[in-house]
Amino acid sequence: MADVSNSEPAIVSPWLTVIGIGEDGVAGLGDEAKRLIAEAPVVYGGHRHLELAASLITGEAHNWLSPLERSVVEIVARRGSPVVVLASGDPFFFGVGVTLARRIASAEIRTLPAPSSISLAASRLGWALQDATLVSVHGRPLDLVRPHLHPGARVLTLTSDGAGPRDLAELLVSSGFGQSRLTVLEALGGAGERVTTQIAARFMLGLVHPLNVCAIEVAADEGARILPLAAGRDDALFEHDGQITKREVRALTLSALAPRKGELLWDIGGGSGSIGIEWMLADPTMQAITIEVEPERAARIGRNATMFGVPGLTVVEGEAPAALAGLPQPDAIFIGGGGSEDGVMEAAIEALKSGGRLVANAVTTDMEAVLLDHHARLGGSLIRIDIARAGPIGGMTGWKPAMPVTQWSWTKG
């Protein structure tokens, strides 16, 4: 979807009014909202919204088209003429207001929000909203909840439909959080409002209203899969065949990659996908593309991404540099495998954005020679990582060294 266009002449006064409406319908609207709906020649909204406000609508009522972009195009075409859009609760909280604001300047939009379902849920529960974690799985994978499952955490989850609470309970149980308290808050603010609390492992709720929020008070079972917040998570948390950047090296690698909000990483030679996964865990806005030539490993990366709660990780099955063609330009690149192949380093350097970071690791002398050459020509930082782990030697304990890793880090000027 295109962003707000600067080519259109400015319109100072708002012509588009976005009104939040709750389950209490017209009764919950203020006088100004009621007047604007009644006077609007055109009103857009979902079927439920239009039904809730039917007693006020005198103009044309337009149901959202599928895909939504078709309706947005229609609304933009009416620029300068009064249009009202009805939305759930707060239109700028995971709502249609965000979509519209990408195409229409904020000065042209008047917004009259209602309380969001999340705000209503927090008030019903007596939770401090600023201390809770908010996760939307509305039209998105339920696995996005996984990184937030820490004992004692309070998580408010926007679901897609009436099956969401049951599916969430099953995810909690399968991840080792079956003793968590799961509260389902249905049709908040409406006549059919219902609030039910159960233990996830004993979840028995039958028919659930499609408009619901799930509140989780996280409690871990013995052996629960708790994902640490710091980079360099235990290798055992990943499914792998031995091709994995070990946790200590991974922590140093991610430090060198220096993730920043909203950035895109290319992980060339994905192995288990651990670098791309931990990059995405740094912030919900992060993106990563992992390139892996082996089909079995590519499938394994996808499974790891799901289990770590970053199902948005893109896996490209193919061999660099050919597999890099056509990919979106990255802010950072990690080369953990295949860097000594012809053209890989050159293609990565060429693709990287100005100011972007490239980090490459070597465990073979062939790849080390490539890194030494690039360091000599381009500069950057070159370090050697030596890790030794204590282990039994006869009846005593000694140090067992791992293969040394040479790491080259470089920022493109």
Swiss-Prot record:
Belongs to the precorrin methyltransferase family. Its EC number is 2.1.1.132. It is an enzyme of class 2 (transferase). Pfam families: TP_methylase. This is Precorrin-6Y C(5,15)-methyltransferase [decarboxylating]. CDD domains: Precorrin-6Y-MT. Signal peptide: none annotated. It catalyses: precorrin-6B + 2 S-adenosyl-L-methionine = precorrin-8X + 2 S-adenosyl-L-homocysteine + CO2 + 3 H(+). The keyword Cytoplasm does not apply. Keywords: Cobalamin biosynthesis, Methyltransferase, S-adenosyl-L-methionine, Transferase. NCBIfam families: CbiE, CbiT. It comes from Sinorhizobium sp. GO terms for molecular function: precorrin-6Y C5,15-methyltransferase (decarboxylating) activity; protein methyltransferase activity. One of its GO terms (biological process) is methylation. Pathway: Cofactor biosynthesis; adenosylcobalamin biosynthesis; cob(II)yrinate a,c-diamide from precorrin-2 (aerobic route): step 7/10.
